[in-house]
């Protein structure tokens, strides 16, 4: 079968300058399209297309707004029973609220206020619920008694005095920066921390006092004349407007909401155990508000604001820190920018290290800095072209693509190594008598050797490459988008590497002057003890085959020990401060670095049935101690009713015989700016958002399964959320590993069968030969997965592809070996099986070993990565390379001997 690319190799040697110009100009032009690659380092890039994902996107599109949470993580020396700690926390929150760069973007996420912190929570509790801080009710009560006791003559005066007393009634507005600055001034009313903490722990509130005042207000007109009632009516209206909101807030559990600001393990006794606190300011991240066009631009701006805020807080003269206090500022924008920047820098560092290591290994083979540089340069060009095609196709890159440059570099260098070594081998075998260096050969001899060596290498490469390409393109059948992109990019990259190896590489070797490399060091083709031993094994092949099968049993059993390691934290470098903060929020604060999970209720929201379904779901969430910050539309309505007396009346009617559901719907329709985060516009769907730890995928799957069962015992509800989907992706990793390996194995088998049927004399022999070439590859995959299991390696975003990559690399080795073995049999039919295999291993086998060590060296640099998935991938792939090499040069010839694919005659010599 003729190789359609042989013509390109001939042209490259005959017209090298033209080919070089076309290759370099074309690839640089193509590489420019790399700017259109879509980079997505978020979790979304790994997500499958399923009902849970669709539901989440529906929820986020319907209810979410563009915002970020700027959070100060304050580590304090001492505990919360010290007044100095609270003064520091109050000052930090006040400074955050007043920070000029953030003020224009404040978003009223927390009941209409942008801030949430321990100090403001205490001051709000003191303001609306704390009996010990009640300095106003006695004065209001006295003023009301004065109105009750007044007669017509002094009624107006008494009403005026009572009107003035209304100003002493606390407002229900959440503390702002000005109020927070008054922490020390209000401490005399509040008392020492131990005093007010005891009152907060008791759960006492002002409900009885306020209800008593409301009763007095309602009775002011009893027994009065109409004229007197007209005088009293304005007082009644203003008092009810001030007291009703306060009364509505008496049942709020202020302490529980504040506990989410302290580490989870300290919540049983936060006042003595807590050593950290969260202070949060919500900001709007709509691009238009920041006067930019793209969300990515906003992310950079918010990240910079977070860094500047941290510096400002640490250096503020208005905040008195103790010696061991620490403060850092976290925002999701800062996390995204610094993590992405670190990954990009690390990939650049690893790629550079890989180039250095590969250069050293290649130089040891070539003994030529020039030839080493050419091979590496062309491989880098091929990688650039690959990224250019990826940009044209607008492929979406994510964290799973981090290993692609190193993978292509290591494999691409192998192809160049095969071409250069085969060229030198052909040149030496042609006529080396009297030649001491490579420069001593004539130009004609070099050109002939280049053509022959390139085309012979290409004959093996073209089979291996297109088998690999079809195999990796079969990833497009996967439901995992990142596997689809990974397979496509690898297939494109392999093609460009092959193309440059058989065109630009021989063209450059033709143009450049030959170097004075000693012939003895340029290439080794003599038999070694190992090559002779490998040939002798084919005389008694069953020994090797049985040993391989016996080895496969215990090693393969390790597959049962394989675990999934697709946790998002593995994609993170904990040495980056903002990443460390991200993990603190997850580990110490019940996953508050995570987007919320959602309970979705499809029901007529404003109806008896809808409210019951909501309350039942809320009771299930409240019963789980790991769940925090559960909130929804009814919490919003209750909070807003403290400010809106009309809404309060509507809500109060819901428990009567004449509930005003339609009025409530009208109110919600008129106030969508308050309810849109939890209520769909048609009032037939509502969501409850809540926080729960979701970094551990298995615990998340189990947790959500149990929660889903509990919710559906009380009615029909669905659960979605980013943490849940990531857990499902983790669960699918094992399936993807099996599916991708199985698909690639099947495709490679079909390709090998088809190629060998077209090359062999009979279809039967072609089928047998294709199967025998494939069999060692499948055994190697079993070995690789088995060793991963025994050594404790996990399947993650990188190693999930190891089975398919092992097959792809293994088929390269198998095709190289069999192609060269066929050449040796054809060249000297009487040499015998030992000589055929020995010479094959002494020549192509030696090049395969060099290529394997080169590839292994390239992947070894991944052990320098700070990211666990990349380190594991590098280690596992080195194992896979060595096993694939061993199977090709030892096991494969023995199998071919057993199945009669190698003539049995021995040489008479």
Predicted regions and their residues:
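Membrane-embedded transmembrane helical bundles of large multi-pass transporters/channels
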Residues: 1-41, 46, 150, 160, ...
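Feature of extramembrane
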Residues: 1-354, 359-370, 515-742, 763, ...
């Amino acid at each position: 079968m003729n190789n359609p690319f042989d013509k390109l190799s001939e042209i490259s040697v005959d017209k090298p300058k033209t080919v070089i110009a076309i290759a370099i100009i074309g690839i640089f032009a193509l590489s420019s399209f790399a700017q259109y690659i879509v980079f997505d380092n978020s979790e979304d890039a790994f997500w499958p297309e399923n009902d849970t994902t669709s539901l989440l996107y529906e929820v986020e599109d319907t209810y979410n707004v563009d915002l970020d949470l700027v959070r100060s993580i304050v580590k304090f020396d001492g505990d919360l029973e010290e007044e100095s700690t609270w003064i520091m926390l109050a000052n930090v929150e006040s400074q955050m609220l007043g920070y000029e760069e953030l003020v224009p973007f404040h978003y009223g996420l927390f009941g209409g206020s942008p801030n949430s912190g321990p100090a403001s929570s205490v001051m709000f509790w003191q303001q609306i619920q704390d009996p010990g801080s009640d300095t106003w009710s006695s004065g209001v009560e006295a003023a009301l008694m004065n109105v009750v006791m007044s007669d017509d003559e002094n009624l107006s005066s008494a009403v005026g005095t009572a009107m003035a007393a209304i100003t002493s009634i606390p407002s229900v507005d959440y503390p702002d920066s000005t109020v927070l600055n008054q922490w020390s001034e209000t401490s005399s009313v509040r008392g020492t921390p131990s005093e007010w903490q005891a009152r907060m722990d008791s759960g006492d509130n002002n409900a009885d006092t306020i209800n008593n005042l409301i009763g007095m207000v309602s009775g002011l007109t009893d027994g009065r004349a109409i004229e007197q009632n007209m005088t009293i009516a304005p007082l009644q209206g203003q008092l009810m407007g001030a007291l009703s909101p306060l009364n509505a807030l008496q049942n709020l559990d202020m302490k529980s909401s504040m506990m989410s600001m302290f580490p989870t393990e300290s919540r049983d006794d936060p006042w003595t155990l807590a050593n950290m606190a969260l202070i949060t300011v919500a900001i709007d991240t709509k691009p238009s508000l920041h006067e930019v066009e793209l969300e990515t631009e906003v992310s950079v701006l918010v990240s910079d604001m977070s860094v500047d805020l941290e510096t400002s807080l640490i250096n503020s003269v208005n905040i008195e820190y103790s010696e061991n206090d620490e403060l850092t500022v976290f925002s999701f924008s800062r996390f995204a920018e610094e993590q992405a920047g670190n990954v990009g820098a690390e990939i650049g560092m690893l790629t550079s290290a890989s180039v250095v290591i590969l250069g050293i290994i290649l130089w040891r083979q070539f003994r030529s800095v020039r030839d080493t540089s050419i091979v590496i340069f062309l491989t880098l060009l091929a990688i650039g072209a690959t990224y250019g095609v990826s940009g044209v196709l607008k492929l979406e890159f994510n964290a799973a693509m981090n290993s692609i440059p190193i993978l292509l570099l290591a494999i691409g260098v192998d192809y160049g190594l095969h071409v250069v070594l085969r060229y030198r081998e052909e040149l030496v075998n042609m006529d080396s008598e009297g030649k001491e260096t490579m420069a001593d050969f004539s130009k004609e001899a070099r050109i002939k050797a280049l053509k022959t060596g390139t085309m012979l290498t290409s004959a093996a490469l073209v089979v291996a490459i297109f088998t690999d390409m079809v195999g990796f393109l079969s990833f497009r059948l996967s439901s995992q988008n990142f596997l689809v992109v990974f397979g496509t990019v690898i297939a494109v990259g392999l093609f460009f590497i092959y193309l440059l190896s058989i065109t630009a590489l021989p063209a450059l070797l033709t143009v450049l002057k030959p170097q004075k490399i000693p012939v003895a060091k340029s290439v080794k083709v003599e038999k070694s003890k190992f090559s002779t031993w490998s040939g002798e094994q084919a005389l008694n092949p069953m020994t090797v085959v049985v040993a391989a099968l016996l080895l496969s049993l215990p090693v393969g059993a390790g597959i049962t020990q394989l675990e999934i390691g697709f946790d998002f934290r593995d994609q993170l470098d904990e040495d980056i401060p903002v990443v460390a903060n991200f993990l603190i929020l997850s580990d110490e604060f019940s996953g508050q670095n995570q987007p919320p999970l959602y309970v979705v209720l499809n029901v007529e929201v404003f109806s008896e049935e809808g409210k019951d379904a909501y309350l039942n779901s809320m009771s299930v969430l409240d019963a789980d101690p790991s769940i925090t910050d559960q909130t929804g539309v009814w919490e919003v309505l209750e909070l807003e009713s403290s400010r809106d007396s009309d809404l309060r009346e509507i809500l109060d009617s819901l428990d009567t015989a004449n509930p005003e559901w339609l009025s409530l719907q009208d109110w919600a329709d008129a106030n969508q700016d308050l309810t849109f985060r939890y209520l769909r516009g048609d009032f037939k769907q509502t969501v409850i958002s809540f926080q729960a730890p979701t970094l551990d995928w298995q615990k998340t799957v189990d947790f959500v399964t149990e929660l889903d069962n509990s919710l559906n015992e009380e009615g029909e509800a669905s659960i979605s959320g980013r943490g849940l989907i990531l857990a499902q992706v983790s669960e699918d990793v094992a399936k993807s590993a099996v599916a991708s390996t199985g698909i690639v194995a099947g495709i490679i088998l079909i390709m090998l069968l088809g190629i060998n049927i077209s090359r062999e004399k009979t279809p039967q022999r072609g089928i047998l030969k294709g199967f025998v070439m494939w069999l060692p590859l499948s055994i190697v995959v079993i070995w690789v997965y088995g060793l991963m299991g025994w050594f404790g390696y996990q399947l993650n975003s990188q190693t999930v592809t190891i089975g398919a990559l092992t097959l792809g690399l293994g088929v390269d080795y198998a095709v190289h070996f069999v192609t060269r073995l066929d050449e040796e049999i054809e060249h000297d039919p009487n040499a015998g099986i030992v000589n055929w295999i020995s010479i094959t291993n002494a020549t192509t086998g030696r090049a395969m070993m060099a290529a394997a060590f080169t590839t292994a060296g390239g992947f070894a640099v991944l052990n320098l990565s700070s990211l666990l998935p990349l380190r594991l991938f590098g280690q596992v792939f080195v194992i896979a390379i060595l096993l694939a090499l061993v199977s090709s040069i030892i096991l494969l010839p023995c199998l071919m001997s057993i199945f009669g694919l190698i003539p049995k005659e021995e040489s008479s010599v």
